[in-house]
């Protein structure tokens, strides 16, 4: 009987060991810029607490056109199953705390100056105390991935040659004026705990990858990881400043995070590229978070089949989403087959009316924008901006001709909770360059569904009035369901 009980107990312990969650943390290397505003600890359920180092990362604070650099914090870890997190604010008393995106419903408890919560899935979060969004903690809770000790392990795991692995293990690397170029059939591996001061470029390459949970930070005005004139590229896991994709095809960006603080700090640009996908990405930027442009910066052509799924956008200036504007007026280029799905927009703070719009399509240069879907997008209360800015326009600062038209745009399950959004704009340009086929389905403003048959709407009112959307000239077939 005792032997049987011992066996059962042993099997239970083995079962717990097999199925218990795991946590992997990465000590920050000497030389990397750190921030002591927060102390972060994490543990698997019932496990030992581990400290997570916090890096210093600049963000942009705008005020009436003036830009001030603020110092926020960044921390990351990998885990499986479920983890408990403690975030302690070291700079004073904590009166209020929240974890965003709010849609993730992260329940918190406050013990003194420590914010406590649990996670059961990978998330990119902002921990904010006392309403301060500029000295916050960006916390990236990653899904666990294999940790490779050397280039040989990477090569074996990916079925490639060791000489084609550019390996950066834990440590600090200052590239000076140099950069990392990733060529065809090569992999750049940036391990957790690695900090590269510099930038990397996938240039005229095919079947290339940039992977790993480490940091690539130029620490100056520069794109961190670029994909240029390339095909069949994967970027998976890093933290950096910007990830533009230009003149490329079949590019996948996933589990990547970008934070910028300088002028022209767009997060994830698409220039004249096709078949580009983004999944589980985070952008906090000092310019547009996500853009889709045609001819621009020596990249030539239109864009089709662009997909963004599971993203967090935070625009400290300019747009969370911006489409159109730039093209070659002689080519009548097209942007089409675009989907944004499952997006949290945490901020827009833009004083200039021309550049407001959490979701903006401002097409110029004879571009036609058509066949797009924006679905399951949640917008927090923004500081300054508008929800929708769809205009066939002629922006003489950046364009050489008006846009060709905006057609067949579906916006489904879009919600906004707040009071600071300005009047939205939907306008065409003339009888030939129109805006048409804009279909809102289940648009909700502060919980109220806006639709053509909504109760209490006088028959002579436009439905758009209840969403504070101005529908201007040369705009046709705008519906609310």
Labelled PLM ranges:
Residues 8-17:
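Bacterial N-terminal signal peptides
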Residues 1-9:
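Bacterial N-terminal signal peptides that target proteins for export
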Residues 185-187, 192, 206-217, 231-241, ...:
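Right-handed parallel beta-helix
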Residues 89, 119, 281-282, 312, ...:
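Non-cytosolic beta-sheet module surface loops
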Residues 349-481:
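Extracellular beta-rich repeat passengers
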Residues 2, 20-184, 195-209, 215-220, ...:
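Extracellular "leader-to-stem" segments immediately downstream of a signal peptide or signal-anchor
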Residues 117-119, 173-187, 195-211, 217-234, ...:
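Extracellular beta-strand-rich solenoid/capping regions of secreted or surface-exposed proteins
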Residues 219-226, 240-242, 262-269, 285-299, ...:
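Extracellular beta-strand/beta-solenoid scaffold signature
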């Amino acid at each position: 009987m005792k032997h049987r009980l011992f066996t059962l107990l042993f099997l239970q312990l083995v079962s717990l060991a097999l199925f218990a969650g795991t946590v992997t943390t990465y000590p920050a290397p000497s030389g990397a810029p750190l921030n002591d505003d927060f102390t972060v600890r994490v543990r698997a359920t019932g496990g030992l607490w581990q400290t997570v180092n916090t890096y210093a990362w600049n963000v942009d604070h705008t005020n009436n056109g003036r830009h001030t650099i603020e110092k926020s914090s960044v921390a990351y870890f990998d885990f499986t199953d479920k983890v408990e997190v403690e975030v302690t604010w070291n700079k004073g008393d904590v009166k209020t705390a929240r974890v965003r995106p709010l849609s993730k419903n992260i329940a918190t408890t406050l013990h003194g100056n420590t914010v406590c919560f649990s996670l059961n899935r990978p998330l990119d979060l902002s921990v904010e105390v006392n309403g301060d969004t500029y000295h916050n903690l960006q916390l990236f809770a990653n899904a666990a991935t294999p940790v490779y000790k050397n280039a040989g392990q990477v090569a074996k795991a990916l079925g490639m040659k060791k000489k084609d692995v550019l390996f950066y293990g834990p440590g600090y690397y200052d590239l000076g004026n140099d950069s990392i170029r990733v060529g065809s059939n090569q992999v750049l591996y940036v391990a957790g705990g690695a900090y590269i001061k510099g930038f990397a470029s996938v240039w005229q390459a095919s079947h290339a990858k940039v992977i790993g949970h480490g940091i690539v930070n130029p620490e100056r005005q520069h794109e961190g990881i670029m994909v240029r004139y390339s095909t069949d590229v994967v970027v998976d896991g890093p933290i950096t400043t910007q990830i533009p994709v230009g003149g490329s095809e079949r590019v996948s960006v996933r589990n990547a995070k970008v934070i910028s603080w300088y002028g022209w700090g767009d997060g994830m640009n698409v220039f004249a590229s096709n078949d580009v996908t983004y999944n589980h990405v985070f952008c906090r930027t000092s310019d547009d978070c996500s853009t889709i442009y045609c001819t621009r910066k020596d990249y030539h052509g239109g864009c089709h089949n662009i997909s963004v799924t599971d993203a967090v956008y935070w625009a400290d200036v300019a747009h969370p989403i911006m489409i159109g504007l730039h093209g070659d007026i002689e080519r009548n280029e097209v942007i089409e087959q675009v989907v944004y799905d499952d997006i949290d927009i945490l901020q827009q703070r833009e004083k200039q009316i021309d550049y407001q719009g959490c979701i903006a399509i401002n097409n110029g240069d004879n571009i036609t924008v058509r066949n797009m879907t924006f679905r399951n997008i949640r917008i927090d209360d923004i500081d300054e901006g508008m929800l929708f800015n769809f205009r066939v326009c002629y922006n003489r600062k950046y364009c050489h001709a008006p846009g060709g038209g905006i057609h067949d745009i579906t916006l489904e399950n879009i919600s906004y909770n707040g009071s600071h959004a300005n009047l939205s704009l939907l306008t065409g340009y003339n009888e030939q360059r129109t805006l048409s086929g804009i279909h809102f389905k289940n648009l909700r403003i502060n919980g109220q569904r806006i639709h053509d048959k909504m109760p209490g709407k006088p028959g002579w009112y436009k439905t758009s009035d209840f969403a504070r959307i101005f529908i201007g000239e040369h705009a046709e077939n705008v519906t609310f369901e």
